[in-house]
Design a protein with these regions (language model features):
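P-loop NTP-binding core
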Residues: 1-255
């Protein structure tokens, strides 16, 4: 969950792609930086912080588009909410019980670039984790730290944490540097079964879309190289989720 790995870009564009496939999706911003909230310029009294703090009792999501719903973080108030989780009796399962009534088909959470009681709560809530990586040295080392942390947390939870790493996505790849190629090769060698084959190269459209408060598929009507790359990656992600769900059902697990 290291910063600078294009987590927000992946979260926003994956959610948008799912919605365009006519499937209900809820995007939750859980980051104090509130990057998703900034992109869409939408806030609401019903946000993640106020839900955790008990200031609102009813779920009311912002409808960004047909099938596309959004729950803001509450920006700086999420810090207070995270502190309240540390004092809760249900310290690591509070959020899972709080969000259980959500009926939207797929929930995607944009996480903060740090480990906290909130991030541990989110690991207890989600079914899958996608690790975004930028192909530089810090991105590579950060990926290793995340994988180790998730594995450690799963052991400490004594089976309560059912989240599994769905895959590792290269979200910012510089085709002009040898370092990017070396890092990509290293990732493939270390986690061959987890790497998504489709990657996101650095493009102007991906950088510009948030400035126009749009996802990559709405920016310039989706006729950009960035949109084509994200479309391929999102399709691969959804295909892998379908495979994992099938495996879970065959083993009698409830997703």
């Amino acid at each position: 969950m290291k910063g600078g790995q294009a987590k927000t870009s992946l979260s926003v564009n994956l959610a948008a792609r799912i919605a365009k496939a006519r499937r209900d999706v809820l995007l939750i911003d859980s980051d104090v930086q509130a990057n998703v909230t900034t992109i869409f310029q939408r806030d609401h009294v019903c946000n993640l912080a106020n839900l955790i703090l008990g200031r609102v009792q009813k779920f009311e999501f912002i409808e960004l588009d047909r099938h596309f719903y959004f729950l803001p973080s509450g920006e700086t108030e999420i810090v207070e909410a995270t502190q309240s989780l540390a004092q809760s009796r249900q310290r690591e399962t509070f959020l899972r019980k709080l969000l259980e009534p959500i009926s939207q088909g797929i929930v995607i959470v944009d996480t903060a670039p740090s480990w906290s009681d909130l991030s541990r709560n989110l690991l207890m809530y989600v079914d899958y984790v996608i690790v975004p990586v930028v192909t530089d040295y810090l991105g590579y080392s950060g990926c290793d730290q995340i994988m180790n942390y998730i594995s450690q947390f799963q052991r400490q939870s004594l089976g309560q944490c059912q989240a599994e790493v769905l895959g590792i996505a290269i979200t910012r790849y510089n085709t002009r540097t040898n370092l990017s190629q070396t890092i990509r090769k290293g990732l493939q060698e270390q986690w061959p079964e987890l790497m998504f084959s489709n990657l996101i190269e650095e493009t102007v459209s991906i950088q510009e879309a948030p400035a126009f408060h749009q996802n990559i598929f709405d920016y310039r009507s989706g006729r950009t190289r960035g949109a084509y790359m994200y479309d391929a990656l999102c399709k691969e992600i959804m295909k892998r989720i379908a495979q994992r769900e099938k495996e879970r059902r065959s083993h009698g697990q409830v997703a």
